[in-house]
Amino acid sequence: MGQQISSQTQTVMNKLPEKVAKHASLVQESGFLTYEEFLGRVAELNDVTAKLASGQEKHLLFEVQPGSDSSAFWKVVVRIICTKINKTSGIVEASRILNLYQFVQLYKDITSQAAGVLAQSETSEEAAESLTSVSSSQASLWMGRLKQPTDEDECCICMDGRVDLILPCAHSFCQKCIDKWSDRHRSCPVCRRQVTGAGDSWVVSDAPTEDDIATYILNMVDEVGQPLRP
């Protein structure tokens, strides 16, 4: 019985449109990513892009925006700064700021593209020329990708409705979809993290600000433990 259900689930997944499947994969990966794994990916991306840009005038530098990862809800507020730097002059030619979803998306794109080229460079002298030709314009190409529209404002369920609510696990939904889901479940539709009530979510107009998050944490603290008496 279990094998039959698993087979049916896989069949459904295989029939999903490519965009939906990719989006679902990125959302799931962002949700389960630990802080240590996140920092490791930032370091890995810097290492990969440095290798690809060897001998070139420009390279990319990824770094976590100071203070943006200090919250318990770092997945929601963390920001990664991507900077394109001229090696010769040291001048910063362009900078972009990414949220976690955008970073994971770019990480997968860059590492998948780089894997083949870097593998060849370890086994063939001819790959050095290939590496040079690929890396010459990659900094500009990848930086350009950051300017393209993303799905960060789309509901994780229908991928159409505007985000109205964000759970502590950083997954976001439109009100219509989450209302239907919460009628029968008390968990996140994506990662299945338990949600005990309305206090476990943000209702947002655009995106949660640091003030929104601070207020949420303060309200949460008010409900924990007992008042401290002198």
UniProtKB/Swiss-Prot annotation:
GO biological processes: protein autoubiquitination
Residue ranges crossing the lipid bilayer per the database entry: none
Zinc fingers (RING-type) by residue: 154-191
Domain of life per record: Eukaryota
Disulfide bonds, paired cysteine numbers: none
One Pfam family, short name: zf-C3HC4_3
Keyword vocabulary terms for this entry: Metal-binding, Zinc, Zinc-finger
PROSITE patterns with a match to the protein in the record: ZF_RING_1, ZF_RING_2
Organism: Gallus gallus
Record has Mitochondrion as a keyword: no
Gene designation: RNF141
GO molecular function: ubiquitin-protein transferase activity; zinc ion binding
Protein name as annotated: RING finger protein 141
Stretch forming the signal peptide: none
Keyword Metal-binding listed: yes
InterPro entries in the cross-refs: RING-HC_RNF141 (IPR043400), RNF141-like (IPR047126), Znf_RING (IPR001841), Znf_RING/FYVE/PHD (IPR013083), Znf_RING_CS (IPR017907)
